[in-house]
Amino acid sequence: MKKTRRILLYGFGPYRQFRDNITAKIIKSLAPRPGLKKVILPVRFHRGQFVNTLERSKPEIVLGLGQSSRRGVDVEAQAANRRRAHPADPPKRISPRGPARIKTTLALKVGRVAGKSRNAGDYVCNFSMYVMLDHIRRHDLRILYGFIHIPYDYEKKKASGLVTKILGRCQRINLKAQR
């Protein structure tokens, strides 16, 4: 019998001019499944909320979802050590002594449905990625981490289908081969 993977799926609530966040809608629309922990976090630069979510969930795999203003779905390849609350502000480092970039560790293959991005921006999506990946790295945790940006105006049913498909693939991942 196959072991059920512990998967943390997180997204975000409303922010700035957006009263709704497509990631919250997607997460709420997904049926419960064994091993899946679904979390919707507030959009804020608060390291503790991300670290605490990781520690409480004890996942084997983390899949983060972020809303974007891009034209298509993007799988993020790395997080950058930079953040800023407003586009006019100069960027600040997330971790003064941390690496400039940290690569994601979950190989997400979604075909032509999504592009590959090496720039997660410098807002809370990137912040969450960097904080979680840095925590995983510094504590030598055996957790695979991936992140997907979804356009705010993307069709919810289509996006939910994509996330459902990815979660199914996550259940079938050979964790030893991925690490």
Q: Residues of each region from the PLM?
A:
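N-terminal catalytic or cofactor-binding beta/alpha core of small enzyme domains
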Residues: 1-123, 132-145, 151, 156-179
